[in-house]
């Protein structure tokens, strides 16, 4: 587990607009090995596109129809030539337990492939664009 960040005032957290979105389509990013390009129904007429570094953990076709939690008010940015209009939230979890004969001081660090990434979602379907609070 990573070290916790310092506390922030509630006003800072209140500025983050978390919403539910439904994945309409997902495909490999044409210019990046680790990214998927997703089209989302976020409750707006135009929807949005988000690029997410989840290709290693998710098959694009398995994402279609899933509901995810997004940060809806991030400024759009270019990721390898594609616009990303938000961020999909996910948890990162180390795979497996440390070997019983491993170093006791935690000196051995797992590589980036030694983790799982799990998308945050809702336990039942809700309207796209619903606010998360």
Segments predicted by a language model, with ranges:
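Phosphate-backbone binding interfaces of nucleic-acid-interacting proteins
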Residues: 1-133
């Amino acid at each position: 587990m990573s070290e916790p960040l310092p506390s922030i005032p509630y006003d800072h957290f209140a500025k983050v607009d978390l919403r539910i979105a439904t994945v309409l389509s997902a495909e490999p990013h044409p210019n990046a090995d680790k990214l998927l390009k997703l089209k989302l129904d976020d409750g707006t007429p135009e929807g949005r596109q988000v690029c997410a570094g989840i290709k290693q953990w998710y098959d694009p076709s398995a994402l279609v129809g899933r509901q995810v939690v997004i940060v809806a008010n991030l400024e759009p940015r270019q990721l390898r030539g594609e616009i990303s209009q938000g961020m999909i939230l996910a948890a990162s979890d180390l795979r497996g337990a440390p070997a019983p004969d491993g170093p006791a001081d935690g000196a051995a660090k797992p590589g980036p492939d030694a983790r799982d990434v799990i998308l945050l979602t809702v336990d039942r379907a809700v309207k796209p664009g619903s606010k998360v609070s």
